[in-house]
Curated annotation (Swiss-Prot):
SUPFAM superfamilies: GroES-like (SSF50129). One of its GO terms (biological process) is chaperone cofactor-dependent protein refolding. This is Co-chaperonin GroES. Keywords: Chaperone, Cytoplasm. HAMAP family: CH10. Heptamer of 7 subunits arranged in a ring. Interacts with the chaperonin GroEL. InterPro entries: Chaperonin_GroES, Chaperonin_GroES_sf, Chaprnonin_Cpn10_CS, GroES-like_sf. GO terms for molecular function: ATP binding; metal ion binding; protein folding chaperone; protein-folding chaperone binding; unfolded protein binding.
Length: 95
């Protein structure tokens, strides 16, 4: 991938949910919930504080995270769908 987020932003590859219910019913795209879990694939350098020092991000590439349903902006790079958001939009890391 050739995308580098700036400042305190991160790029997340959403983890897709099943397209069928346990009973075998196929869920159409229009009825699917937006995924709220994903894996971080790129991170910015951090945010600059009032003293001009860069504070690095806590999240790192490979972390699996939980984020808000409407967080971030969806983009597509080389056919790969990503969500770009600020680190503060992430609720936490999934272990």
């Amino acid at each position: 991938m050739s995308f580098k987020p700036l400042h305190d932003r991160i790029a997340i590859k959403p983890i897709e949910h099943e397209e069928k219910t346990k009973g075998g019913i196929i869920i159409p795209d229009t009825a699917k919930e937006k995924p709220m879990q994903g894996e971080i694939v790129a991170v910015g350098n951090g945010i600059r504080n009032k003293k001009g020092e860069i504070h690095p991000l806590e999240l790192k590439i490979g972390d699996k995270v939980l984020y808000g349903k409407w967080a971030g902006t969806e983009i597509e790079i080389k056919g790969e769908k990503l969500i770009v958001m600020k680190e503060t939009d992430v609720f936490g890391i999934i272990n």
